From Swiss-Prot:
Organism encoding this protein: Pseudomonas syringae pv. syringae (strain B728a)
GO cellular component term of the entry, any: cytoplasm
Subunit structure: Homodimer.
Domain of life assignment: Bacteria
Entry comment, domain topic: A Gly-cisPro motif from one monomer fits into the active site of the other monomer to allow specific chiral rejection of L-amino acids.
Protein name from the UniProt record: D-aminoacyl-tRNA deacylase
Function: An aminoacyl-tRNA editing enzyme that deacylates mischarged D-aminoacyl-tRNAs. Also deacylates mischarged glycyl-tRNA(Ala), protecting cells against glycine mischarging by AlaRS. Acts via tRNA-based rather than protein-based catalysis; rejects L-amino acids rather than detecting D-amino acids in the active site. By recycling D-aminoacyl-tRNA to D-amino acids and free tRNA molecules, this enzyme counteracts the toxicity associated with the formation of D-aminoacyl-tRNA entities in vivo and helps enforce protein L-homochirality.
Pfam families to which the protein is assigned, alphabetical: Tyr_Deacylase
């Protein structure tokens, strides 16, 4: 399972004209699910997202986690993170999980996040979404569990 974390001042996801998820300061995470991923992969990714130190302390060092700053978590499914881009000029998606598995694991990740953290929002799995964000830094990390 891949998670592309971006530290944001704010972010929102729209499907059509409807805002389906929004946060203020926090992290936006694009989530790519692969066929070999399991609930254990989701648990490992969630632990990293909530506890990885991406926010600055009073000395300006990235020393604080999402939990410590009380920021929002916005999860957005993105199957293109599992793309094979090594050859040619067109991505291959055979490394992406089938939609049923992807939906199941994304829903699991989201439900566990809502149990573990007070401010969680999400995009809509499988939808054509517009993601708006104000990067903070920018600070971006790629996790691969």
């Amino acid at each position: 399972m891949k998670g592309l974390l971006q530290r944001v001042r704010s972010a929102r996801v729209e499907v059509g004209t409807e805002v389906v998820g929004a946060i203020e300061q926090g992290i936006l995470v694009l989530v790519g699910i692969e066929p070999q991923d399991t609930r254990a992969s989701a648990d490992k990714l969630l632990h990293k997202l909530l506890n990885y130190r991406v926010f600055s302390d009073v000395e300006g060092k990235m020393n604080l986690s999402l939990r410590e700053v009380g920021g929002g978590l916005l999860l957005v499914s993105q199957f293109t993170l599992a793309a094979d881009t090594k050859s040619g000029l067109r991505a291959g998606f055979s490394k992406a999980a089938p939609p049923a598995l992807g939906a199941e694991l994304f829903d699991y990740l989201l439900s566990q996040a809502r149990i573990a953290h007070p401010t969680v929002a999400a995009g809509q799995f499988g939808a054509d979404m517009q993601v708006h964000l104000i990067n903070d830094g920018p600070v971006t990390f790629l996790f691969d569990t």
